[in-house]
């Protein structure tokens, strides 16, 4: 097998891995939505009242 063929196979594997990772990540967003909402609620509850958390203006502002 030549270097060109090995490089093409490598690119194919990287592309396939990226596509599978991207589609599985989008599919899991719906299932993790309640957990994400709980985390943001905890940030608002415990962090927004403290001056140390000024680095999250889009959540607390």
From Swiss-Prot:
Residues where Cysteine amide is found: 60
Gene Ontology CC entries for this record: extracellular region; host cell postsynaptic membrane
Keyword Secreted belongs to the record: yes
Keywords recorded for this protein, A-Z: Acetylcholine receptor inhibiting toxin, Amidation, Disulfide bond, Ion channel impairing toxin, Neurotoxin, Postsynaptic neurotoxin, Pyrrolidone carboxylic acid, Secreted, Signal, Toxin
Principal location listed in the UniProt entry: secreted
Matching Pfam families: Toxin_8
Residues of the signal peptide: 1-21
Residues making up the propeptide: 22-44
InterPro entries assigned to the protein according to its UniProt record, in alphabetical order: Conotoxin_a-typ
Residues recorded with modification Pyrrolidone carboxylic acid: 45
Entry comment describing in which tissues the protein is expressed: Expressed by the venom duct.
Intrachain S-S bonds: 47-53, 48-60
GO terms assigned for molecular function: acetylcholine receptor inhibitor activity; ion channel regulator activity; toxin activity
Subcellular location: Secreted
Function: Alpha-conotoxins act on postsynaptic membranes, they bind to the nicotinic acetylcholine receptors (nAChR) and thus inhibit them.
Domain writeup: The cysteine framework is I (CC-C-C). Alpha4/6 pattern.
Similarity comment text for this entry: Belongs to the conotoxin A superfamily.
Protein name (Swiss-Prot/TrEMBL): Alpha-conotoxin-like Lp1.6a
């Amino acid at each position: 097998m030549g270097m060109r063929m090995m490089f093409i196979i490598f690119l194919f594997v990287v592309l396939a891995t990226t596509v599978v990772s991207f589609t599985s990540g989008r599919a899991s967003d719906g299932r993790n939505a309640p957990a994400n909402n709980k985390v943001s609620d905890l940030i608002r509850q415990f962090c927004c009242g403290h001056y140390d958390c000024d680095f999250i203006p889009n959540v607390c502002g």
